[in-house]
């Protein structure tokens, strides 16, 4: 939909509800929740009427982008882990290592001005923690789907540019390593979202009914994820 010089893209979710709702999220996504059976023309009319309000909120959220500044990997800089900020403490050591001690990322390198080395060490630490924490999160989320007699997917972890997670047709659940920066509840949300695709490949009404059933507070978790990592 075009409003002035801007094109507004929106996603429609059909759900068992009586009224239509429009929401603008911090990441710039516009979501329309409509009662099952609502005609597309009716949705378009509502969006056109609310176009000014939608653009106002999109502009509001844009002022905060990018939320995370470019990282320099120097002492005193803050980095996220499981939703909390920790400062870097860099010191000289015989071998490179990263430890999380008393609210600090304590990084040892052979040269204090080696920001590239600090970055590599921290990313390797994140990858190691992601492997462990994501497996724990998966085990928390899986029982709800095991009851549905669905095939257990294989878990894969790697860095992804544009997605937090995905589920392949071959049954591989891939999670973005960077998700380790988010709170545990948000990691659980991403995993649960992808697991719902085992039964519902698209984002139709059945998908959201299942998501609502296994995780009633999924919208709050999604919102918190957007606030933390957008």
Which residue ranges define each predicted feature?
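Walker B catalytic acidic pair
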Residues: 194
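Active-site-proximal or metal-binding-adjacent scaffold patches in catalytic folds
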Residues: 1-189, 198-230
């Amino acid at each position: 939909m075009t409003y002035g010089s801007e094109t507004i893209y929106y996603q429609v979710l059909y759900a068992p509800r009586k009224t239509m709702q429009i929401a603008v999220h911090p990441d710039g996504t516009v979501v329309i929740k409509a009662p099952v059976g609502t005609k597309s023309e009716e949705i378009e009319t509502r969006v056109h009427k609310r176009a000014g309000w939608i653009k106002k909120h999109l502009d509001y959220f844009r002022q905060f982008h990018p939320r995370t500044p470019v990282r320099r990997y120097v002492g005193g800089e803050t980095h996220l882990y499981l939703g909390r900020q920790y400062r870097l403490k860099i010191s000289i050591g015989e071998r490179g290592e990263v430890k999380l001690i008393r609210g600090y990322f304590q990084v040892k390198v052979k040269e204090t001005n080696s920001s590239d080395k600090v970055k590599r060490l921290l990313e390797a630490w994140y990858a190691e923690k992601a492997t462990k924490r994501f497996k724990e999160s998966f085990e928390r989320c899986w029982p709800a789907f095991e009851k549905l007699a669905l095939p257990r997917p294989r878990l894969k972890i790697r860095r992804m540019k544009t997605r937090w997670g995905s589920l392949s047709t071959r049954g591989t659940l891939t999670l973005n390593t960077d998700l380790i920066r988010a709170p545990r509840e948000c990691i659980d949300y991403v995993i649960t979202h992808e697991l719902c695709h085992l039964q519902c490949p698209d984002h139709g009404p059945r998908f959201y009914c299942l998501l609502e059933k296994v995780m009633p507070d999924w919208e709050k978790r999604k919102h918190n994820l957007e606030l933390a990592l957008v």
